[in-house]
């Protein structure tokens, strides 16, 4: 029973917020490379369930983007997002931070 409480405390319901630049990046991937677009959706789903572990090698960012996290979309491109207690802000899905 104690284990159940720990699990429920770790998983929080957060609202996913998609910033305009992120939506534009997703549109780009749908038009240019649907395979990468599908991977982006997998990373969004994984990041929404557990923002700090899972697929895409999640890592905390430093310096100007301290507090943000990234997941590897391709060798060159990353999904960047901010996590708070109540929401996950998806900021970009192209380029590196």
Which residues are covered by each model-predicted region?
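Enriched for short, Lys/Arg-rich terminal
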Residues: 1-15, 24-41, 55, 61, ...
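Solvent-exposed, amphipathic alpha-helical segments
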Residues: 43-46
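Blade/loop signatures of beta-propeller domains
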Residues: 49-50
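Short interaction-prone segments
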Residues: 65-67
């Amino acid at each position: 029973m104690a284990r159940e409480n720990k699990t429920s405390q770790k998983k929080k319901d957060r609202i996913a917020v998609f910033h305009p630049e992120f939506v534009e990046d997703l549109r780009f991937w749908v038009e240019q490379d649907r395979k990468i677009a599908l991977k982006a959706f997998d990373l969004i789903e994984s990041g929404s369930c557990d923002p700090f572990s899972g697929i895409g090698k999640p890592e905390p960012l430093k310096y100007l983007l301290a507090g943000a996290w990234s997941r590897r979309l391709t060798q060159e491109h990353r999904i960047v997002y901010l996590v708070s207690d109540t929401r996950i802000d998806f900021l970009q899905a192209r380029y590196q931070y």
